């Protein structure tokens, strides 16, 4: 599957509005220009208006005149984060996007008790990869938000990822809780949690998906590896969602896919009242565009 299909899917929905916090960033403006060109969304850009216009004039001279674009000046990154979050809270926008603002600053606004977007559940990072040679999306969670989630948090992280998967057409996603081995070992918490999540799925506590674990990474994604080890499972070798036990595992796998496998990626923060595009400054404009498309699909489900 190609991530370009997410852009096509997103354009089929009713047009959404994206609120961008601190939009004075070259890659952000590039992604916004590409999104508008593809009729992906409308945008409200919060930030230093003079800098935003300067970036537009350098690369996209007519962009500022586009009727699908609104620029609202704010005096600081923190203020832009607050205004962008409030725009989503007040239903003036459907998606929140991070621009040139620290992650901690925008998350502080998202979690604000007065005007924030907390929905009572765990916020988690969900990344959708297009891996060369694979015939399906690889969905990875959580590589950026939850450091060492417990069983209850892993269950909610799974639900968040399943919701994202369904929004992009994976109707009954197969979830592999990842561990170092395929058997339950009382000395390895990841295997205990994986077994519990599998049982929860069978009892209907984790609905709308198929969960089976623990599974090592090779057995989760490769039918050949699973067959060699004699693992019989509805998930082994066919996993849509890789649920990692810790942020270190997720972060290393995320970056390995990008830098070693040359995978493409789009990612969102799920679990809030609206999807959040929280890409890093190192991410390309293409990756930001895929993340926008993913967020729009999620907001439209």
Predicted regions and their residues:
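Anion-binding alpha/beta catalytic cores of soluble intermediary-metabolism enzymes, centered on
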Residues: 1-235, 240-244, 249-301
């Amino acid at each position: 599957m190609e991530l370009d299909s997410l852009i096509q899917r997103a354009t089929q929905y009713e047009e959404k509005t994206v609120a961008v916090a601190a939009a004075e960033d070259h890659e952000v403006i590039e992604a916004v220009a590409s999104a508008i060109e593809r009729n992906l969304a409308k945008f409200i850009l919060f930030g230093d208006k003079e800098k935003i216009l300067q970036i537009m004039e350098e690369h996209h001279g007519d962009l500022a005149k586009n009727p699908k674009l609104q620029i609202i000046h704010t005096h600081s990154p923190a203020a832009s984060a607050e205004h962008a979050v409030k725009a989503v809270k007040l239903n003036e926008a459907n998606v929140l996007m991070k621009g040139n603002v620290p992650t901690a600053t925008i998350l502080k606004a998202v979690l604000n008790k007065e005007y924030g977007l907390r929905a009572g559940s765990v916020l988690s990072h969900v990344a959708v990869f297009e891996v060369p040679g694979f015939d399906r999306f690889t969905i990875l969670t959580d590589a950026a938000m939850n450091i060492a989630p417990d069983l209850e948090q892993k269950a909610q992280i799974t639900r968040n990822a399943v919701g994202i998967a369904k929004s992009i057409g994976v109707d009954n996603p197969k979830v592999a809780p990842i561990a170092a081995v395929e058997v339950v070992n009382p000395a390895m918490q990841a295997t205990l949690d994986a077994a519990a999540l599998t049982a929860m799925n069978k009892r209907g506590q984790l609905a709308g998906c198929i969960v089976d674990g623990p599974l090592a990474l090779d057995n989760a994604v490769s039918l050949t590896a699973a067959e060699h080890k004699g693992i019989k499972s509805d998930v082994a070798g066919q996993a849509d969602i890789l649920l990692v036990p810790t942020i270190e595992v997720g972060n290393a796998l995320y970056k390995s896919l990008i830098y070693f496998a040359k995978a493409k990626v789009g990612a969102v923060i799920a679990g809030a009242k609206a999807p959040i595009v929280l890409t890093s400054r190192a991410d390309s404009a293409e990756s930001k565009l895929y993340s926008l498309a993913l967020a729009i699909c999620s907001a439209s489900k």
